[in-house]
Amino acid sequence: MKNIFKSTFLMICLLLLLACEAKDNDKKVTDSISGIYPHLAYYNNEAECGTGAVVPWADRLWVITYGPHLPNGSSDKLYEITPDMKQIVREESIGGTPANRMIHKESNQLFIGPYAINSEGAVRAIPYSSMQGRHTGNARHLTDPANIIYYGSMEEGFYEVDVHSLEVKMLYQDGNKDGRRHEDTDVNPTNALLPGVHGKGLYSGQGIMYYTNNGEGTEEALRKFDVEAGVLAEWDGKDWNVARRNQFVEVTGPGGIYGNKNPETDPIWATGWDYKSVLLGVRDAKKGWSFFRLPKASHSYDGGHGWNTEWPRIRDIGTEASPDYLMTMHGLFWSFPGTFTVDNVTGIRPRSAYLKVIGDYSRWNDQLVFGCDDSAQKEFLNIRKAKGGIEGPGQSNSNLWFTSLTKPDELGPATAEGAVWAKEEVKAGETSEPFLFSGWAKRSCWVSNSGKNDVTYLFEVDAAGNNQWTKLKEVKIEAGKAAIIPFTSSERGEWIRVTVDKPTYTTVSFNYATPDNRTTGADNMFAGLTKVGKSNSMGGLLYGLGKNRRALGLLANTTTAGSVVETGYYEMGDKLELIRKDDTETSDFIRTKFAIPQQVVTIDNSSVLIVDDDGRRWRLPLGNEAFKPLTDQALLRICREVATERDLFNCMGTFYELPAENADGYAKIRPISSHNLRINDYASYRGMLIMTGITPEEGKDNPHIIISNDKKAAIWAGVIDDLWKLGKPIGHGGPWKDTEVKSGEPSDPYLIGFYDKRELTLSHNSQKDIIFTVEVDPTGNGDWMEYTTFTVKPDESLKHQFSGDFEARWIRFKTNADTKATSFLIFS
């Protein structure tokens, strides 16, 4: 009996121990981080692994991935996600570069990529030998929609597919017909059928099939963002017509993935852009196309080749009873009205700014699911000296991002700008295209009259979105002069347009901002990241491993009293457990290839000086002075790609979104948030943003802090869009601080855009009055305009508060005499 009691007691103790261990493991291992389920990440063996389409169907979520230029198939897969978040890799997968999706109601099938999926989840694949190309869109057939659908490829291959037999009939041959392998960084293949390259959208309605592309197949387009590129084209079943020669992406209608319910009369919508602003088209069956312009929050999507966009969309994320359209375009989530027609162009509104690169999205189980393009093994043309010799991850991977239905309203401020005319000749009496005027609390317009005549600019508004225009105001601008035109809250309208009374050479840029209600303090999710003033921290260099290891490598270090010592090599898989490994080869590789580059920026007493890869000079604000020695010693990562084909730049306590050089790079940099964190390194992995520089005891209750099993290494895990919660951008500095300046010579450009409150102080050491001329560039395109002049007396520190409706991208200064000058700005 005694032995029985003893055995029972031991068994109870063992069970309690196991229960405690399981509880501890539950604390350590989290199913999801910031809406990312690490085990749902997908990999391929290609230079990029983006998400082409995300569709709920047959009680599952179906996902396809793509590699960069693979018209004959690839290692990419078709994935089936179950409601309990299990990932099934379908054995029918044949890969490629697909981004098409359509639900064909009559046959009750989902067409996604080269696959047809019935209502029971059975999959059939259409081989690339029958239908070559990078499948970019589907459309309902013009004459037999019950039995046939259209497929379109990125190189203008067009096909009819029998929905029953999947028999394929080629209408126009794909541009990859020669069978040669296309290098990912070469000029896009061209096809004689249509202008432009890099197809994006396909749809049908009003007796027409519509096709878009967003690039140009020239060497020039690989380098520049402001070349002629792209097309919106129409096909009536016999002949092609170019509707507009610009970079277009989405083309759809209120019927979305199903096709329009009333195809003869329902509107067709198209989104695109040029170097000036976002384009929005709407087509009426009788009146044809009407076009409108919207501002850009992010310029990282620009580029004449069209590669930087993935697939911007307009998707219905509502319910069958209550449709709700969400649009993605140039870094903004937009609310898009399902009632948008040529005669009712009201209701489009900005929601919030985002950083993820999104290929497709949908509503599933009362959440939003965004399919992203996160970690490309090859950075393509996105190389710059600020990154040093760093590479992409060893293997491309991306993930789904699950969010609440309200997340599109909760990210970054919707500050944005766009032009209707940009350094161009305009005729007398010419009227601009309508530009969106509603949706922002702070609005202004910059106008530069570089012509020979004094010009009156007439501003008109369409108050109700019904094409009824009324005069808002007239502004006369002298030849060779510029002006900022603020708009009050009482000056209302859906759209605004501009007319000039004389011929001129002009720029007209609308610059809008929403109030930044963030504080300067970080959200609790960042607890445990080391403060910059501390001399002790757990850091490390990060690398997503290749060779199908599907883990994150961390070459850990510890900083004690300012001295950095390497502490070992660790790996983390999809269970988010940091485990020490003995791997000299990988350790050496990370140490060599992912070392933080030396002296890629210059931090002087006035600001951060950047000389970009084209030799252009830019200046950014300073932050906490403790960042300077750490930056100079290459202890803080400055620049890295953590979302495909754009960089995350971190300098002097501010994170910035940095477009690729071919999207104009630093000229279009955008501050995200400011912080006081000693971040050693950062990288993307399985859809997450990973950062090092941890004080573990301060983050012990934070699920975003992951500590190794031996307690000697740690990382922070979240998503890139968590960075909006670090705190609003702040800083101080300027292009001059007790600087010897020459009369009439402009200073370097200094960033002023996207900050909340801005104060300027001007001073000099001369014994006479000095006139300071203040110029701004509202667009980032070198559109320098005089803002104002200030006369500063000897020994005076002149202060100027910028008004709340002031918004521009860059600022610079000139003086009317040689002097030693200071131009100092505080952003708070």
Please identify what each model-predicted range represents.
Residues 489-506, 804-819:
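Noncatalytic modules at the cell exterior or secretory-pathway interfaces
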Residues 360-422, 681-740:
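Blade-level signature of beta-propeller repeat domains, shared across WD40, Kelch, NHL, RCC1
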Residues 68-72, 117, 156-157, 216-219, ...:
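Short glycine/acidic-enriched loop and turn motifs that connect beta-strands
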